Each structure stands twice: as C-alpha cells, then as structure tokens.
C-alpha cells in the first residue's frame, strides 16, 4: 500500500471511482486518507446481491448502507443507485430515500426496492435541488392524492412492482416542466388533475388494466359502466405530453385511450409512434390515435398479434366494414417497422392492408422473430420460402421498399435466396 499512499489525492480518488462501492468501501478501511478519498467518490452504486439466508446477512447489508451514507455527509455525490429487495424494513428505506439535505449535489438517483411507497416521492424529491434523473422501482401509490413536483428533473422513470395486484390509484399529478424523458409503468389512475410535462420529447407509457376492466371495455353499450367511467381521465395524462416527439405505448394504454376517444389530444410534434401488441388485447384505440398524429413519420409495431373485436376500428384488416383503412389513409407515415414477425397468414394480410392503406408509405422493415420457446411458421419446412416470395411480390406491386430482415438461425437461409 506504500506505493499507493504516495499518489496524489486526485489519483487515489480516480482509482476508487473504478471500483464497485463495496470494493471502494473495503479499500477505505486501509487508512484515514483512503477513507477520506472514498467520501469524495462521485458515484455510489449499492446492490443487495446474492442470497440472504440468514437475518444477520440482511442486518449487515443495512449497516453497510448506513455506514457508507454516513461517510458522504459533505460529499459531492452526483449519482446514487440503491437496489434492494424484500426484507429491508420500510423505515430504513424511507430514511435512505430522504437523503436530499446530505446530498445537495446529487444529479442521478436510482432506487430499486419492493417496499418503497410512491408517497415517499412527494416528500423527498423537493430536497434534491439539482436532481436531473430519477428512476424508481417501487411498491405502490397510496389511495390519497399525490403530486410529483420538480423544477430540475429532466429524466423520470417510475415502475410500480406487482401493481397488477393493486387497485387503481385515486389521483396522481405531475408538475415537472423541464422533463424531457418520461417512463411510466402503473395501473391507470382514476384522475390526473395536473400534468405539466410540456417539455417531454420521449415518453414510454404503460397504463395497466386488470382482466375485468379489459372485459368491460370490450362489452357492448358500456358507456355508462361505472368502472370504466373512472378510467376515462387517462386522456389528461396523454394531453400533458402532447408535445412529445417519440411515443412508446403498450396495448393496455391503447385500450385506455379507446375509453376517451372524444378527448384524445392532437400530437402535432409526434414523429415516431411505437405500439407493443399482444394476442389477448385489442386495437380499439388505434384509429383515433393515428388520426391525431398529423405529422407522424415512423410507425413501429412490436408484433402484429392482437385480439380482434368489433371495436378494433378501421385500422384492423380482420373486421369487415365500409370505412376499413380510413384512419390509415389519412396518416402521413412514411416508414413502417414490424418486429417479431412470425410468418402467419394473418400477419401477411395485415401487412398487405398497411401497404394498400398507408398512401405516403416509402419503406417497410419486417423483422423476423428471434427463435424462442415456441416454433414460428418461419421454421415450418417450405413456409420461409413462400413468405419470402410473397414479400417480394409486395415489394414489386406497391410503390415502397419492403425489406425482410432476419437474424440468427434464419440468417443463412435468407442469405442463400
């Protein structure tokens, strides 16, 4: 250690910055000088890893966090990441989360815990005056009204763990005027009284519904359904991010939007829209969403599988109706990406429907699904070649460039064509 001890303080601090927080903490035991340099390390990353078969191991972890944070009392910490699962007492977690007064220079905060409640955000967020990035994997919102407010925050990610087992939050507001990136995964709230997110450029929204709510949404004559009426304020959240340029949504989010079609905001700045699909969920909100994106350039489908209902609207090829494709015809999208293509006839018919209806389309990129647990039609003998020929015909017949992109085990087969 004599060789290291002769190094300047700046060099020692730089060396410690390359170690994990646990390794740096162990090194700080060597001497008071090393301990002082550890307190100046700008990034803390504390991860509860491995098995915790004994209570003393858990207690040791909590004591370790307490000691590390105690060393940082006057430090210039800019990034703090804390990851812990079940077993840590909520009071201990709340104490760790309320670190604003002792970390005044903190710019990035990452919390991954199964037992932090979202009401903690409203309490501790104002204590971080220069915080720019916050990522939280948390337990649940309480039943009362909550407001997330920050003047400095530019990137916010909220993931509620296991929220499918909870009731819908009552009221959530966001007042973050400088936010440019917003990622939100939660049960849809009954109301969003204030959503000031006008600077958001990219948003990833996953508003979740339970199976009963999905079933009610598909039922005929559901306009007066009390359960659905409480979910129709989802448009307020979307209206708050109406200036977004890139929007990624889940199919549940699309179904929430189908409940408030008349209040759907117009996304004048939206250039890229990505929709994640699933076999058990429908496209009820797709038509009105596409009609409200007047400057859309790129449309991405993460899979084309969806649950066909009479409310899928004119965007769906499987429902026979006179106005089929009307929302697509009016959409100015130039580039279409289809991911997770499995080679089914239904998918090919949908692609044909898109090629016919999107009048401004210039390029279509179709990505074959990676080989997974279930066999796709692309792996059926002879089917790959048939699909390749059909897509070539699409490329020749329609006035746009259709590309079929494959990887892994199918790559050699496609290259040989």
Curated annotation (Swiss-Prot):
Entry-linked InterPro entries: F-box-like_dom_sf, F-box_AtFBL13-like, F-box_dom, FBD, FBL60-like, LRR_dom_sf
**Domain called F-box: residue spans:** 1-53
Per its UniProt record, what Gene3D superfamilies does this chain match?
A: 1.20.1280.50, Ribonuclease Inhibitor
| UniProt xrefs under SMART domains | FBD (SM00579), FBOX (SM00256)
User: Would you tell me the protein name for this molecule?
Assistant: Putative F-box protein At3g58950
**Lineage from the top down?**
Eukaryota, Viridiplantae, Streptophyta, Embryophyta, Tracheophyta
């Amino acid at each position: 250690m004599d060789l290291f001890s002769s190094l300047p303080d700046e060099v020692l601090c730089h060396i410690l910055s390359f170690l994990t927080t646990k390794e740096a903490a162990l090194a700080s035991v060597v001497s008071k000088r090393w301990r002082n340099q550890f307190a100046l390390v700008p990034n803390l990353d504390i991860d509860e890893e491995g098995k915790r078969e004994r209570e003393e191991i858990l207690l040791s972890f909590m004591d370790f966090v307490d000691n590390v944070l105690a060393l940082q009392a006057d430090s210039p910490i800019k990034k703090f990441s804390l990851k812990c699962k079940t077993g840590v007492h909520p009071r201990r977690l709340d104490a760790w989360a309320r670190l604003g007064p002792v970390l005044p220079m903190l710019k990035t905060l990452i919390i991954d815990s199964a037992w932090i409640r979202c009401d903690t955000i409203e309490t501790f967020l104002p204590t971080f005056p220069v915080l720019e990035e916050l990522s939280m994997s948390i337990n649940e919102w309480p039943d009362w009204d909550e407001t997330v407010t920050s003047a400095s925050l530019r990137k916010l990610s909220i993931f509620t763990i296991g929220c499918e087992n909870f009731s819908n939050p009552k009221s959530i507001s966001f007042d973050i005027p400088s936010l440019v990136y917003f990622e939100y995964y939660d049960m849809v709230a009954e109301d969003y009284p204030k959503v000031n997110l006008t600077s958001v450029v990219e948003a990833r929204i996953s508003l979740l519904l339970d199976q009963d709510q999905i079933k009610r949404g598909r039922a005929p004559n559901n306009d007066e359904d009390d359960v659905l009426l409480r979910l129709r304020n989802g448009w307020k959240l979307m209206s708050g991010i109406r200036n977004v340029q890139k929007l990624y949504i889940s199919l549940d989010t699309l179904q929430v939007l189908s409940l408030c079609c008349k209040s759907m905001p117009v996304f004048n700045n939206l250039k890229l829209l990505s929709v994640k699909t699933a076999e058990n969920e429908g496209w009820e909100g797709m038509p009105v969403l596409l009609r409200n994106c007047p400057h859309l350039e790129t449309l991405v489908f993460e899979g084309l599988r969806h649950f066909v209902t009479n409310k899928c609207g004119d965007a769906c090829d499987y429902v026979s109706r006179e106005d089929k494709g009307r929302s697509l015809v009016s959409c100015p999208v130039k580039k279409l990406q289809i991911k997770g293509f499995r080679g089914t006839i239904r998918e090919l018919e949908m692609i044909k429907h898109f090629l016919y209806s999107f009048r401004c389309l210039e390029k279509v990129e179709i990505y074959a699904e990676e080989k997974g647990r279930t066999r796709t039609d692309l792996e059926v003998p002879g089917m790959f070649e048939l699909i390749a020929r059909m897509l070539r015909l699409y490329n020749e017949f329609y006035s746009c460039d259709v590309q079929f992109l494959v990887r892994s085990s199918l790559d050699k087969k496609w290259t040989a064509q």
